[in-house]
């Protein structure tokens, strides 16, 4: 795991030397995936986690037609199990953080922590607890890193289902205000006490088709405005190039009526989202880039669009 950071640091040094740019201007963000990405069949897009990380293991409908519907949210009468799931996810993320922090050179090479493609509110809370626990391990103030959590918005909606009654989870999806509460709320939703929740520097959306990002950002921006919070978090946007990942075939493709778009079109759409979010006035700044199936063409086009919009800044 730590060798990837060493490779990134070496690439940074070589690029700085060859391009004659200050090495301090090149930042390394450690990308850490959701628990669902570690499963044999990845579930970071839908959040169907097996116990103790979730309510039940995923069962493909064709494998067992009689199986109960798959769900990623606990019922209202399963609060104890939900608390256990959050604790298990905290342990998962903390173990990985400690693996990097244990080596001083590795940790010095990292400039920011990017938790990405996170589909569940309880996993966001778990990540906050893991970062807090790492800080409590004895990190000096100068050793702490800016960090953020990027959610995935499959089809334009946050994947987590709303909690239902004793029978099943509700068919609706978690509202934007509830997602924000998982990111920035200061209370222990389980009422256990003792757990500390670090506050991320930014809210993000990644691994989502750019066509769906506008809806997600608008909803979250409105919810953030409604809170009236004085602090302004940053916004991180890393949409896909447009293709969708099929979890059954494990392949990327153009599904659901989507069609290939050129880099200029992709960058133009993302630029419009950045302008709208900036004009909303609730974000401290915007960090923008690309995720899956974006390449040099998209990023060059994006750079031109952002240059015409003016700088968005950086997290500091």
Segments (PLM) and residue ranges:
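Domain-level signal for soluble alpha/beta catalytic cores
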Residues: 1-316
């Amino acid at each position: 795991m730590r060798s990837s950071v060493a490779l990134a640091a070496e690439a940074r040094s070589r690029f700085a030397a060859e391009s004659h740019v200050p090495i301090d201007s090149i930042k390394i963000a450690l990308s850490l995936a959701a628990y669902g990405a570690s499963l044999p069949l990845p579930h970071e897009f839908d959040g169907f986690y097996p116990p103790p990380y979730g309510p039940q293991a995923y069962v493909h409908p064709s494998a067992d037609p009689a199986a109960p519907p798959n769900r990623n949210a606990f019922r209202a009468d399963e609060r104890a199990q939900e608390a256990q799931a959050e604790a298990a996810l905290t342990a998962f993320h903390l173990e990985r953080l400690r693996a990097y922090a244990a080596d001083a050179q590795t940790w010095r090479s990292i400039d920011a922590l990017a938790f990405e493609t996170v589909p569940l509110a309880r996993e966001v809370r778990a990540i906050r607890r893991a970062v807090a626990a790492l800080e409590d391990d004895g990190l000096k103030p100068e050793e702490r890193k800016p960090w953020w959590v990027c959610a995935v918005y499959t089809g334009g909606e946050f994947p987590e289902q709303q909690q239902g009654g004793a029978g099943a989870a509700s068919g609706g999806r978690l509202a934007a205000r509830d997602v924000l509460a998982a990111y920035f709320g200061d209370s222990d939703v389980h009422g256990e006490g003792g757990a500390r929740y670090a506050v991320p520097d930014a809210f993000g959306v990644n691994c989502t088709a750019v066509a769906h990002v506008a809806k997600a950002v608008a909803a979250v921006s409105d919810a953030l405005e409604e809170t009236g919070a004085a602090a302004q978090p940053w916004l991180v946007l890393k949409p896909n190039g447009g293709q969708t990942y099929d979890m059954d075939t494990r392949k990327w493709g153009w599904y659901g009526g989507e069609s290939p778009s050129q880099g200029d079109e992709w960058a133009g759409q993302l630029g419009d989202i950045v302008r709208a979010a900036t004009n909303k006035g609730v974000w401290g700044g915007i960090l923008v880039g690309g995720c899956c199936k974006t390449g040099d063409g998209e990023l060059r086009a994006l750079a031109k669009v952002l240059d015409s919009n003016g700088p968005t800044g950086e997290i500091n």
